[in-house]
Amino acid sequence: DLAKVSIDAARNKLMDILSNYQGFIGCTLILVFDAYKVKGNQGEVQKYHNIYVVYTKEAETADQYIEKTTHEIGRKYKVTVATSDALEQVIVMGQGAYRISARDFYEEVERTEKQIREINERERGEQKNYLLNYAKEEDAKHMEAVRLGEITEK
């Protein structure tokens, strides 16, 4: 597990995965990291590529941040919260948000990554790069004639 080696590397990998997911799905995505035990932390919201990354402030848990944010925007926008915490699910649903379990969200992200790979492989197969595609027309005709044995180069 990457988290056992470096928590920062694990966070960055998660942010990259969710950034790809967001780009494919097209939703606004907010990733919340718990930083409530970090002394003097003022909290921070960063833009990482196409997602928002929140580090909670000292004495504020990720759950508290999610509850507050869901309360502010949950009735105006379609908000989905990924959590397996049963109490948190009840609270955010009471604020008008949808909920998805962490396991279900993980599986959705995995399916999305698979779709992205399949699309990339299909497009890569359709866009083969051949030298003749980039040659001038007269050079391409000459090389084709050589290939077919119509012209012998000495």
Which role does the model predict for each range below?
Residues D1-K154:
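Nuclease catalytic cores that cleave nucleic-acid phosphodiester bonds
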